[in-house]
């Protein structure tokens, strides 16, 4: 059986990237919360 994590930067960005976050209202809430917390990296 194959391992479950087969990394791909493109696929990862499509789900967790900045533009993916900004595309939905809830994603924007995520970015806003991470900004408020002072995270250096806002998204993948």
UniProtKB/Swiss-Prot annotation:
InterPro entries: Ribosomal_bL34, Ribosomal_bL34_CS. HAMAP family: Ribosomal_bL34. The keyword Ribosomal protein applies. Pfam families: Ribosomal_L34 (PF00468). It comes from the Bacteria. Keywords: Ribonucleoprotein, Ribosomal protein. It comes from Mycoplasma mycoides subsp. mycoides SC (strain CCUG 32753 / NCTC 10114 / PG1). Belongs to the bacterial ribosomal protein bL34 family. The keyword Ribonucleoprotein applies. One of its GO terms (cellular component) is ribonucleoprotein complex. This is Large ribosomal subunit protein bL34. GO terms for biological process: translation. One of its GO terms (molecular function) is structural constituent of ribosome.
């Amino acid at each position: 059986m194959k391992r479950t994590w087969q990394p791909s930067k493109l696929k990862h960005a499509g789900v967790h990237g900045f533009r993916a976050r900004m595309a939905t209202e809830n994603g924007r809430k995520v970015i806003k919360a991470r900004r408020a917390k002072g995270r250096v990296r806002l998204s993948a």
